[in-house]
Amino acid sequence: MSVESFTPTALQFTQGAAHKVKSLVDEEGNDRLKLRVFVTGGGCSGFQYGFTFDEDVAEDDTIVEREGVSLVVDPMSFQYLAGAEVDYQEGLEGSRFVIKNPNATTTCGCGSSFSI
């Protein structure tokens, strides 16, 4: 019998996203806030991304730190986000956090819905 260990693929947190999180945290005046990224069922492609700020971190959450701020992902969402990149973009459509997910087989035009 053999036992294989599993090492999850890292979640990337870009410098642009980290700077925006830091700016928003500073604006709120609460350095305990972290950006929580999650996946829920729904959207036009089956799953959708969500973002919120959270002070709490569960024992089994994955934490990615950059530029003195933290991105937090729960274990259920991490399985869909392993290897993805969380970025912040500003453009004609407005400003928003975006996820570039290599696991997604299809994505919606809005960028917040995907399928695997």
Swiss-Prot record:
Its cofactor is iron-sulfur cluster. GO terms for cellular component: cytosol. Iron-sulfur cluster binds at C44, C108, C110. It comes from the Bacteria. The keyword Iron-sulfur applies. InterPro entries: FeS_biogenesis, FeS_cluster_insertion, FeS_cluster_insertion_CS, FeS_cluster_insertion_RrpA, HesB-like_dom_sf. One of its GO terms (molecular function) is iron ion binding. Keywords: Iron, Iron-sulfur, Metal-binding. Binds 1 iron-sulfur cluster per subunit. One of its GO terms (biological process) is iron-sulfur cluster assembly. Belongs to the HesB/IscA family. Required for insertion of 4Fe-4S clusters for at least IspG. Homodimer. This is Iron-sulfur cluster insertion protein ErpA. The lineage of its organism: Bacteria, Pseudomonadati, Pseudomonadota, Gammaproteobacteria, Pseudomonadales.
